[in-house]
Amino acid sequence: LQWLILDHNLLENSKIKGKVFSKLKQLKKLHINHNNLTESVGPLPKSLEDLQLTHNKITKLGSFDGLLNLTFVHLQHNQLKEDAVSAAFKGLKSLEYLDLSFNQMSKLPSGLPASLLTLYLDNNKISDIPDEYFKRFNGLQYLRLSHNELADSGIPGNSFNISSLVELDLSYNKLKNIPTVNENLENYYLEV
């Protein structure tokens, strides 16, 4: 079994028994979208590449440590705060796509892997960006921070000067000035 899709059910964490997923040694895709999960599922098999847990009620993430093939993680439309996210992704060197949009983060989470190419954090409550936060994401290409609480004072001058960045969405924030961006940027969204 390589794909397991359990979308649009009434699954709860208490009904998912022990190591049910880790026994599936060839599993590459696990989708449990639109359910009643309150925390991430696990343990998960090392073969997993794509994990989708969207439209749940997740407030807690376990560690994804050891999932060396995990490339895509979709966690949008949950109830995650930055503290729940910070430790979960440490050590993942293959993670390229992370969607944390439509959650309850007021700060950017720490500990995200430098391997990310796509990072979606739109529709949260993020109000500022720590200095040089995005500097370690050498290959970051797509960044969405629209529908947050970002204001000019919360964005250090060099925040978006990322040479690899091709798309940046800062729409629907509280910006009065246009932040500095790298000349390689192809798509820049600042709708109000």
Curated annotation (Swiss-Prot):
InterPro entries, per database record: Leu-rich_rpt (IPR001611), Leu-rich_rpt_typical-subtyp (IPR003591), LRR_dom_sf (IPR032675), SLRP (IPR050333)
The keyword Repeat belongs to this UniProt entry's keyword annotation: yes
Top-rank taxon, per record: Eukaryota
Gene3D superfamilies on file: Ribonuclease Inhibitor (3.80.10.10)
Entry GO CC: extracellular space
GO molecular function: collagen binding
Record PTM text: Sulfated on tyrosine residue(s).
Keywords per UniProt: Extracellular matrix, Glycoprotein, Leucine-rich repeat, Proteoglycan, Repeat, Secreted, Sulfation
Locations listed in the record: Secreted, Extracellular space, Extracellular matrix
Family under the similarity heading: Belongs to the small leucine-rich proteoglycan (SLRP) family. SLRP class II subfamily.
Quaternary state and interactors: Binds to laminin.
Record-given protein name: Lumican
Higher taxonomy: Eukaryota, Metazoa, Chordata, Craniata, Vertebrata
